Amino acid sequence: MPKWELERTSPGCYLITMEADSPSWHADFLLSSDRHHDNAHTDQRLELTHLLEAQERDAGILDIGDLHCAMQGKWDKRASTDACRPEQREGRYLDSLVDCAAEFYEPFADRWLFMSPGNHEGSILKRHETDLTERTAERLRAKGSPVIVGSYAGF
């Protein structure tokens, strides 16, 4: 059995199965949301510190929405070039969000288990008919990730 087995059990519900090999067995996970990775004010060094710790602890990574900020496109009335990273100022804005995020997260692809969209990604899907979460997950899968893309949900 691989370290993690993932499956969707019903809409909005997902199961991660692992095999315990001793009474003292434990598993670590990095649970994150609202990374807003592409925003100029995001602390990517801290983000990297957390990812490296997940790698060191052999932890799975679960991200539950708004990995992308995606608010700096010319169509968004809230857009501000001050909140835009230099790599997103060169045209192809939506493509650059996926490219930059994938490049940053690919070294951790093998432990990225779950990724779901937040309202930021949902807004892009609604207005521009491109799924940033699925596109980012596809890039991670190309590097061997078992990542499952969840759905937008709340309580």
What are these regions (language model features)?
Residues 1-18:
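Short glycine- and acidic-rich boundary segments immediately preceding or forming the N-terminal edge
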Residues 152-155:
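Short, intrinsically disordered, charge-balanced linker/junction segments flanking boundaries
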